[in-house]
Amino acid sequence: MRIFYPGDTGYDDERSGFQTGLRHEPQVIFAVENARDVEQAVHHAETRGLDHTVHTTGHGLTTPATGVLISTRRMNNVEIDPTTRTARAEAGAVWQQVIEQASPHGLAPLSGDASDVGVVGYTLGGGFSVLAREFGFASDRVRKTEKVGDVVTALEFDLLEIDQVHAGELHFDAEHAEAVFEAFHSWDLPDHVTPTLTTLGDVVRLTFASTRPFDVDHLRVAPTLIDEFGRKPFAEAAGKPLPPHTYQGDNVLLDDLPLDVLHRVRQAASNAGVPVFLGLMPLGGALKTEATHLLKLISPLLGVEQQHEEVFDEVRSFVVGRSRNFRYAVG
């Protein structure tokens, strides 16, 4: 284990992560390699009355830590048991490691759309995978949790017998947003299909995945900029890493989302005065939750909480909660 203090060589690298707009400001960093190291870090914090925060990739950074930072990047072992179809991932492991080791056995985890995200943080937040409506939350598959105090040091979880999936994406020019939103909203969605709708500036993107065949012809309501759909290895549908950048985002869980309200949300995001990218995921299927939709907002800059809340005002009467998975740079 290495220990870093402000001013030490390596301190800045150790406290940095995927989120470049915020960085932790800890008094000390414990770069742990095993559970015994974690125990020492937690003991250091508790005996000095300091808070302790776990840091792996930094994707989900909400509030910068000022006490003890427990960096788990070196504690990243992954073990696959093809006989029991399970995986054990240490606190610093990322999904790409699990995918690469599981795929030769025809197995796959319930990972999300970014393979460089940490396994533990994602799963503890619930875990909305690219196959969520077909198989449920990633957290539903956890068999065993290993902990030191309140710090999770490893998870053991089920893998699924998945080799190939039916998946793809459609991109449209934003001038066709109204028609695309209506087609997406009216989709008589099979329980085994997990779709998302995302606005990306001048583009509206639809994605979808399932282990079983399904049809998306009804979504082609305008000329497509990208039209890619077919059978492919799970790893190709599991998302590609993005470069580190600055961003702020939040989400709400809704128990209904009428079409007219969805259009108001779209218009509010477009007129926010700052870039606001909207993401919508229908829930249901194997996701055991009262919510019917997950609505998330993200911007490539900080200081936009007010603008996001003004967009969320359009759905306030339908809000039943928030997901821990999609909260970035917010308290």
What positions do the PLM features span?
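Soluble FAD-dependent oxygen oxidases
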Residues: M1-G331
